[in-house]
Amino acid sequence: MECSTYTSSQPNLVWGENIDVEISGVGRNITEELRDVSGGKKERRMQRLVRKREVNEAGRLMSTARNESFKRAVSLYRAGAHLSSAMTTVSPTSIIHLFKLSPPNGRPRAQTRVRCSIAEGPTISPSSVDGRGTVDCVVVGGGISGLCIAQALATKHRDTVPNVIVTEARDQVGGNITTVERDGYLWEEGPNSFQPSDSILTMAVDSGLKDELVLGDPDAPRFVLWKGKLRPVPAKPTDLPFFDLMSFGGKLRAGFGALGIRPPPPGHEESVEEFVRRNLGDEVFERLIEPFCSGVYAGDPSKLSMKAAFGRVWKLEQIGGSIIGGTVKTIQERNNAPKPPRDPRLPKPKGQTVGSFRKGLSMLPDAISKRLGSNVKLSWKLTSISKLDNQEYKLTYETPEGLASVQTKSVVMTIPSYTASNLFRPLSDVAAGALSQFFYPPVAAVTVSYPTEAFRAECLIDGELKGFGQLHPRSQGLETLGTIYSSSLFPNRAPPGRVLLLNYIGGATNPGIKFKTHSELVEAVDRDLRKVLIDPRAKEPLALGVRIWPQAIPQFLVGHLDILDTAKSALRDIGFRGMFLGGNYVSGVALGRCVEGAYEVAAEVSDFLSQQAYK
């Protein structure tokens, strides 16, 4: 029996790791003890108990009490429930009830002492989730992946996974999603936007954010810096002939290569650079794909895996013999397959656009967390994982109230791979070693503002800066990876007459940025912008925010998928079925892929628990 099998009717009564059950020789009955607690010694006794409070393993504690005795103790406690209002007036408090128990088998009566703690805020007990002390799933990590997995389980798989909790080591949810609002500005210091796929739109609608969605102008141009000039990027392949970013010869090479007139695939896993140069030519790589890799992954395309980082494009060649052949085959298969009806609740974005929310991306994790309510546990740091004899898991946490343990049928680890590696080390060196191999380079998000008149005239359209933003190939000599025109992309991001720019700097090819000061990073960004976008004579920018992420974006390097499979196989080999890996190093780094991956993991958890139910 677990201590957490009893759930108090009082919502802030803590059971589980904060219950001590001991056999005691104290010869007083319940009425005497209650009289003592409520008398003049009340204050001193409460303070002494708080100071001496110990946290013990629930299983060890329960082994000291007979099951029948504990049941009788619980019954007596319920009979004294009228004390709950008095108990909640002191927080935190420990009150001891000494229950005089009748022997169930004629043996000398034992004395059971039950200590309860009154906690501030929501209960920390897992038993509060389902009343039994064992939950169906614990999602470790309250970033966007973890929250979306929990939301997907709650909305799509409630019948098979009714009881889910999310634990987050920090005091807030959202992971790298960080929205700041100040002095009329609203900016992001992590991800900036998302592709409005049906998955992320469903998540937004289910979270009550349909009316908060904002979508960018689908016609807003994207620019790449090439030879000192910002050049628009073709929005689709058919636009390629009409843009000056590439030469006529480069366009021909790309077209013939896409049709399959190019060298055959090699016998090894290709990097992004190898794949693109072979299929589409040098110009496409150098002027489009290389800056795109820098903008999305902050990565080095000579090391990124095409199969892992851009698997959908890689697969086209596999299924169709060429990029065009695979595209045609994919369209045919899609047209021939029965198409499920689209959720009528979802908005219909127009064209190639991006999305956010009226008050920034943080609205999504905040809304999901609010819907999950007390099932989201903040400031819960996972310290150990163990497998129980009944094939369930025991997770032990450091919490603001002390140690707490949760017993669960399944676990989804959405924390960064390097953190998961440390937790798995005592269980599997192979799994821990595999997860430790993933590389996260540093990236800094630098947000600045200029007045509209500070921009070069040739960069304005009808007197305004319009567009999504600009990317900078490494060969062009700028340190910043790219710049997003935040106030042009979404409304109400800056005061009238001001332009808000979000700049990313660092990445796999420039890891030294983590040693720079904030002022040095602002100077680097301003220096680069004056070479391209800002009038060199303009005044210094208003520096709003600098956020350095020391380990920002997992790199999907060559061998990434094999390493991930090694970690998963190692967990299966030690009997850790029901232990799932999630997060951006599994699903992909784009916000939309994190949400799509969340639905996929939720389905896997549901399938696992459904199978377990029939065993």
Predicted regions and their residues:
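Peripheral membrane lipid-binding modules
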Residues: E2-N29, E33-R35
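Glycine-rich FAD pyrophosphate-binding loop
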Residues: A154-R182
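Dinucleotide-binding Rossmann-like beta1-alpha1 core, especially the glycine-rich loop
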Residues: D183-P265
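A short alpha-helix-loop-beta-strand transition element characteristic
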Residues: L201-F223, E283-R287, Q437-Y440, I461-D462, ...
